[in-house]
Amino acid sequence: MQFFEGCSDGTFEMSEDWLVECILCGQQHRIDRRFLNISIMEQGDVFEHYFWTELTCKGCGGRLFVRTKVYSNKNGDFIREDHECDDVDYIQPPVIRDARRQSCSLTNGSKRITYGINRERFTGGRRMDNLWLLTEERPKPSVVNQIVDMYCKDFDDRITVHNEIKIKPIIVDGIFKFVYKVEGLAVAGAADIFIKTVSGSSSFLDFLLFKQENAPTEGSNEDNLIMAIEETKTSDDESRNTGVYQRGSKFVYITPYYQNVKLYMLYNEELEAREEKKPSDTSVFGTNILLTLGVTIVGKDISRWFRPFRSLDELIRFKAGMRKPPAGNVPITITKYADRIEVSGRLAKPADAGNIGHDPNIGALSMISACIRKLGWDKDIVVTLHGVTQSYVDHTRGKNKFLYICSILGMRLDGIRMPNHVILPELYWHYEKKSEKMADILLHVQTMYHGMYCVYENHAGCERGYFRTKTGRLVTLPKKDRNGVNLYLPDVVLYDEDTNFILLVEGKMLSTLQLGIEEIENYDSIEQEYIYPEYGNVTIIRCVSIFGGNCASIPHEKVLFYLADNGRIIINKNAPQCIRRCFAETGVRI
């Protein structure tokens, strides 16, 4: 390999300064072409000419890496170019010229290289896209890995780096930039993989994957959403309804906002499922509907038991052949008439409440009705035996997720005067800036990045996790303790093996700080029934994480971790050593 400094290696020249932009903060930089690092590597019949530099962003302090690679044959003829950058993109494509025709010289130590310049210009340079994963959930390396595998399979890309996957919060000078970067995993078709926390306006799928240069914009029609994914840990062994039905409405609700996105149901079962066991009729029926709707199933073998419905009559026959619920329950039935199809199912919960609150049936009726439309039915769909009152529907003024689905699919409730104009929320998603989970998820991810591990997580608005024993066994925690009292659970339980510390963290907004202080007094049962029996003589700290406001110091002695609205982080001065270690060299105040 040959090494040079300057703007030319004798074959190619960067004839103009580089203009780049930090994708974390938007700061623009001009890079002097005279001070580039250059190297040449021979790969068989191809020569790779590397032009690169590193710099510190003037805006956020992040370390930026910029590189252009030019390929040539043995004669020095241009083949192609590409650009590989960390946390930075080109504002304008580099201007590359053939450097062999008009005499000129470049000093490389004591070695002088003769080269030339002509007017032949090699353009290139569409800035490389990034992958942006938007989610309401705590980003997990295993799920990111699965999603990237799915992306590569369906979008003709390939993984180029696959080491231990770690998720790093971007913290610069003590300020969290509200973005996470994936390390240890890279693909050929994207410069970087970033994660941002969002919330849905109503019925939101767990993950949205965009492929584009910059972060997606709320409400934009120009963004390139390529995948929408729902994740579930629930197996057919654990629940007859929840895994397949409860999430069904989400695949319908997204359609007015994004018509051409690929949809996925990801079974990420942490508990082992019994693959050889025949799934329940409910599981088969619901999964077949998802397949009919074009949803790709991942993490569950569909080759033996499942297939899409081929006709409306097949859908109706299958449902009619399923086992009926116990007496007193309203069965879900599908009945076809000449001018309508009636689908029965109770939406009220409790049965006499008159509301729309039965989540599994909301999902089931949404899925069934969407499937009926998919199979070609264009007449009325009427939901019967629903238990919903007119006064409840009038009170909602159409602002209800099932009424949104009714509007999307052209459904109506039997005996109910439906709202005249149901207006869907303007945004399908928005960046989260008002949830307590912003602080406790950041604390969770930062500590895991530095070697601590999660014993339990139940972040606000996220799927509830399992209790992890010291041997790695996963346990589903009950709703009650041994005395029949509600089992109070923290938002996250973190363990540091080196110091034998366990942190029980309750996440709250600044406005609900006092409630958090009171709630951590209720953790006796989880400590005595689960933590001490599994982890022995550990040191346990009960504490609160806070998001919101603009405090200049820790707002209460029980607050371990504070995240301000602008991203500024403050750590309690009495924080244990394991927390101090995790935030060392980030500029965070302690």
Locate the predicted segments by residue.
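Interdomain/boundary linker segments immediately adjacent to catalytic/signaling cores
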Residues: 119-184, 287-289, 318-464, 470
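Cys/His-rich metal-chelating microdomains
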Residues: 28, 63
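Short cysteine-rich clusters marking metal-coordination/redox-active sites
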Residues: 22-25, 57-60
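Domain-level recognition of nuclease-like catalytic cores that cleave nucleotide substrates
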Residues: 265-382, 536-590
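Short metal-coordination and nucleic-acid-contact micro-motifs, chiefly zinc-binding Cys/His arrays
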Residues: 15-21, 49-53
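Short, intrinsically disordered terminal segments enriched in charged and Pro/Gly residues
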Residues: 1-17, 35-46, 65-120
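Active-site metal-binding core of divalent-cation-utilizing nuclease and nuclease-like domains
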Residues: 162-223, 451-500, 510
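Catalytic cores of nucleic-acid endonucleases
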Residues: 234-279, 487-490, 495-503, 507-565
